[in-house]
Amino acid sequence: MTAEQTLAPQERKENSYRAYKREQEVISRHKIYKTTALYATYSIIILVLAIRSGSVLWGLAFIPVGIIFWMLSEYTSHRYIFHHKFEVSEETPLKKFFTTLGVKYLDPMHTGHHERPFDGNHMSGRIRDLLPMFVIGAGLGIFFFPVAVITATWFICYLAEEWIHHATHFYNFRDPYFRYMKKHHMYHHTKQGMKYGFGTTSGIIDYFWNSRYPEHIRQRLYGAKKSIAANQAEPQA
């Protein structure tokens, strides 16, 4: 009799589940390695050029624009695209193209992530997912350097979101920010939480977009001293 066979059924189930999570964590992490290698390299080069340019302040002034652009695009895509149930429309060829794209790719991708939150194949983005945006942003950046800075900043934020999202699913933390984000995001994966908590790296934007969890849920998740994002101080309604 093997050591595995001597374990109680519950222990065998828990060991199997932990092994499954470790396996999926590796799959997800290796996908992020690839996207990080490409997009971080470009972004670092552009930001170094901005710092070394003759007009440093002018170049770096567009970093906040990139951050704001990222926060808005992350939230709106998560709430209004990934959580939208597409139906193929025959109204116009263009509308048919985009709705077919949604039905074929976007719906299965995010629905699969919610149904199997530890599936590494549905966890992290691939290089090709954002390649069109990268090509457009980097291409325009050749002629308009501020666009390159905005693109580089956006992709740095995207990579940070990918790693934070990966971490909230697979790791446990003592750090207050990550403990907060793990509770915030994992509750979003429940049936009751899917209509709230669309910010993946911060709960601040949910406050401004009126998609925070209800008060009784926040009390249960965070306790009396609720924290929001990095500063651990939630704005008062």
Can you say where each PLM-predicted feature lies in the sequence?
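Alpha-helix C-capping/helix-to-loop hinge sites
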Residues: 83, 166-170, 188-191
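Non-catalytic, topology-defining segments of multipass membrane proteins
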Residues: 1-158, 191-237
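Alpha-helical transmembrane segments and their immediate juxtamembrane interface regions
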Residues: 147-181, 236
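Divalent metal-coordination and catalytic microenvironments
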Residues: 78, 165, 185
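Small-residue-rich segments of transmembrane alpha-helices in multi-pass membrane proteins
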Residues: 93-95, 178-188
